[in-house]
Structure formats: C-alpha cells, structure tokens
Regions:
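Conserved GNAT acetyl-CoA-binding A-motif
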Residues: 98-104, 131-148
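Conserved acyl-donor/pantetheine-binding loop and adjacent beta-alpha core of acyl/acetyltransferases
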Residues: 63-111
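Amphipathic alpha-helical scaffolding segments
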Residues: 39, 64-67, 124
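Hydrophobic, Leu/Ile/Phe/Ala-enriched alpha-helical segments that form helix-helix packing faces
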Residues: 19-26, 125-137
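Short amphipathic alpha-helix that is part of the acyltransferase structural core
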Residues: 1-36, 43-59, 66
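Short secondary-structure capping micro-motifs at structural edges
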Residues: 36-38, 47-48, 87-92
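Conserved acetyl-CoA-binding loop-helix of GNAT-fold acetyltransferases
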Residues: 103-108, 113-132
Length: 151
C-alpha cells in the first residue's frame, strides 16, 4: 500500500499542481488560478489541505476557506462563483472567533480517483484541521460545500 502524507504547507508549484488536477475535472471558469490561491494561503495558511504520495507529489487537495459573511452568502445564493473569490475576502483565523467556512475545489488526481485510502486521508486532514481550530476556540458558525462533478 502506498504511503500517503497529509500536508498543510505549500508553495506556488504545489498550487499549480492542484490547479492542473482541477483542470482535469472542471471548466476554466470554475477554477481559481494558482497565483490567487497562493494569495489566499499567504493571508491564512490554514486554507488548504493536501495529500502527498510516496514521491512527495500532491495528488489530492481541498480548500477550506473562512469567508467573509457576505461572500459566503453570495456563493450560497448563487450570486457569486467560487472561482471569483479573492484573497481580501478570506478571513484570517483569530482565537475565540467564529467563521463561515466554504469547502472548495475538492480534487483528486484521476489516477487516484476511486482510491479509498486517498479519500480517507484527505478527510482525515480535514478533521485534523478542525481539531486545530477547536484547540484555538475557533467556532464554525456555518459550513458549506458544493459539488461540481459526478464521480
């Protein structure tokens, strides 16, 4: 069984790999550029979870975005596309505060698409992130995810 690693630290090359994985599933209009996602991450380094394979390559990822309440509502009410989110609409986590969270761009490299271990590793990464937030007394007021593909 291939060794997988949950990852929370990324550079622009990692985000380019994630963007390319997304291009294998989504239309260009539904994809945020790697450069913009890097800005999200620079503002709040707990906005992305990845899975690396034994070769240290990113093979799966999800963005977990603490959005400003108005932006969250606009996406929920279909007035805004998630690909249009820019870094100044992302919140920085502060201890003892609450946030509106959007799970965005859940993507798995097609070679690993139906790999149970990859999927469960990515979900474990999400749970670990939520545990990190709990330890800082950060509350999630609302959470939302949207599916764009059929698997």
């Amino acid at each position: 069984m291939e060794k997988l690693k949950i990852e929370y630290k990324f550079d622009l090359e990692d985000f380019i790999v994630m963007e390319n994985i997304e291009h294998s599933y989504f239309l260009n209009d539904n994809i945020t550029t790697a450069e913009e996602v890097m800005k999200w991450y620079e503002k709040n380094d707990l906005t992305c979870i990845g899975v690396r394979n034994a070769d240290n390559q990113i093979i799966a990822s999800v963005n977990i975005l603490p959005l400003k309440k108005e932006v969250f509502k606009d996406i929920y009410e279909n007035r805004m596309n998630e690909a249009d989110v820019v870094y100044n609409q992302i919140e920085e986590y502060k201890d003892d505060n609450s946030y509106h969270i959007y799970l965005s761009s859940i993507s798995i490299d097609k070679k690993y698409k139906n790999n149970y271990k990859v999927i469960t590793t990515l979900l474990s990464g999400c749970m670990n992130l939520l545990d990190m937030l709990i330890k800082r007394n950060i509350k999630i007021e609302k959470i939302m995810a949207d599916a764009s593909t059929i698997h």
